[in-house]
Amino acid sequence: MKNNCFSPEEIIKELDKFLHRNDYENAEKYLLDWLCKSVEADDVNIEILVRNELMGLYRKKGRKDEAFAMVEGVLEKISQKGLHENVGSATTYLNSATVYKAFSEPQKSIALFERAKAIYEKSLNSNDPRFAGLYNNMALTLVDLKRFDQAFDLYERAISVIEEFPERAPDIAITYLNMANAVEAQKGIEEAHEEITEYLKKAEEILENFPDKDGYYAFVCEKCASVFGYYGNFFYENELKERARRIYEGN
């Protein structure tokens, strides 16, 4: 019998305590325990939630086999329960596609992104912020497939969505850095030098002018830092890392 007492919010709240400490070992144990509970209780929503979290955890830790097993398990569950057109399932398709992208399976990745995109376009308003995440992640796979024009189109569409939500402006910085990587992949670093420089300038301008230096901003700084370092701007890389550290420490 399905147990209706399981709270997704409480599960994620407890999980975040492990993740904030980078305690991935106990985060995994916690999630596997909830996976067993959800299967025993036939709580499909909780099972899908937990499998999504586990696939993300395994992706971050580079554990390909376990990540793929979670993807296959959650896709099978969605199929069994007839949830193919559900918006929540679209998010699962997106997460699964990201796993396949991370482990160099772009064809499998793009197929799932296309499924997610079709559901989002049918179910959500065109300026729903979830589109920004879809477009950004899908574009990364399109770059792997050397479908550069489509990738840049999605990056521009992601920016258009994010611009509707000023509090998420730092995500545009991430998009510009993704575009720098994309134009390098398309043309090579020498030919693309001027375009790369322009994308980096745009990203830096956003990061410097964003007013709310909170935990979200710190996360974006950390994510962007290595890209600036990759392109030789070691000073700004270190500045972003230090900025994030100060925010996390509350100074």
Model-derived segments and spans:
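Short coil/turn linking the two alpha-helices of tandem helical-hairpin repeats
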Residues: G82, A97, L124, F165-P166, ...
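Short coil/turn linkers that connect adjacent helices within long alpha-helical scaffolds
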Residues: K2, E40-D43, Q80-H84, K122-S126, ...
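Amphipathic alpha-helical segments of tetratricopeptide repeats
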Residues: L35-K37, G73-Q80, K117-K122, I159-E164, ...
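Residues that mark the junctions of alpha-helical repeat units in TPR/alpha-solenoid scaffolds
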Residues: S7, E40, E47, G82, ...
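Conserved alpha-helical positions within TPR/SEL1-like repeat arrays
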Residues: I12-H20, I48-K60, V87-A102, P129-D144, ...
